[in-house]
Swiss-Prot record:
Comp. bias (Polar residues): 1-34
Comp. bias regions, Basic and acidic residues: 39-56
Ranges for region Disordered: 1-56, 78-151
Designated gene of the protein: YPI1
Subcellular location per the Swiss-Prot or TrEMBL entry: Nucleus
Keyword Nucleus on entry: yes
GO MF annotation: an example: protein serine/threonine phosphatase inhibitor activity
Lineage: Eukaryota, Fungi, Dikarya, Ascomycota, Saccharomycotina
Biased composition regions of type Low complexity, renumbered to the chain: 87-98
Organism: Eremothecium gossypii (strain ATCC 10895 / CBS 109.51 / FGSC 9923 / NRRL Y-1056) (Yeast)
Alphabetical UniProt keywords: Nucleus
Annotated protein name in UniProt: Type 1 phosphatases regulator YPI1
Similarity comment: Belongs to the YPI1 family.
Pfam families cross-referenced by the UniProt entry: PPI_Ypi1
A Gene Ontology cellular-component term: nucleus
PANTHER family attached to this UniProt entry: E3 UBIQUITIN-PROTEIN LIGASE PPP1R11 (PTHR20835:SF0), E3 UBIQUITIN-PROTEIN LIGASE PPP1R11-RELATED (PTHR20835)
Length: 151
């Protein structure tokens, strides 16, 4: 019967439950040691805005960096073609042109003046040289060298 007993033991399954306790290591500073605090001179100063700092579009976002370049409108009512572009733009450095600020003109007259200025601006010939974003380098000479094997 010992062989039967061994077979019955082999067919049995045993469940063993092992319980582990997790150990947590907590590090604490020694109570006698004190962490040195920063002196008042070393503390980081906070930004304080003057009253003359402009609020960015009334959103309480005050910035010190310039985020865009302002190009004042040019006054096209003066037909002086001899003036250079930067001189005329600095001469009309107000936020809008004179015709828009002119209260003697009604809405339709100001509108027509704006349309005329816009047409003049579009009709002016742009310089033929491309700007930095439009410039495309010419690699044709390199392409021909590598295609023909003239390395």
């Amino acid at each position: 019967m010992s062989s039967n007993n061994q077979e019955s033991l082999a067919n049995r399954s045993h469940t063993v439950t092992v319980s582990e306790t997790s150990q947590i290591l907590q590090l604490r500073a020694n109570q006698t040691e004190q962490v040195p605090k920063l002196a008042k001179k070393e503390q980081k100063s906070k930004v304080r805005w003057d009253e003359n700092v402009v609020d960015n579009e009334h959103m309480n976002k005050k910035k010190t960096k310039i985020c865009c370049i302002f190009h004042p409108q040019q006054n096209f009512d003066d037909e002086d073609g001899g003036e250079c572009e930067h001189a005329s733009s600095s001469a009309s450095s107000s936020s809008s042109s004179e015709s828009e600020n002119d209260t003697s003109m009604d809405f339709e007259a100001r509108r027509q003046a704006r349309i005329a200025r816009r047409r003049q601006k579009l009709e002016r010939k742009r310089s033929s040289s491309p700007n930095a974003y439009e410039y495309q380098p010419d690699y044709s000479q390199y392409r021909q060298k590598y295609l023909h094997g003239d390395k």
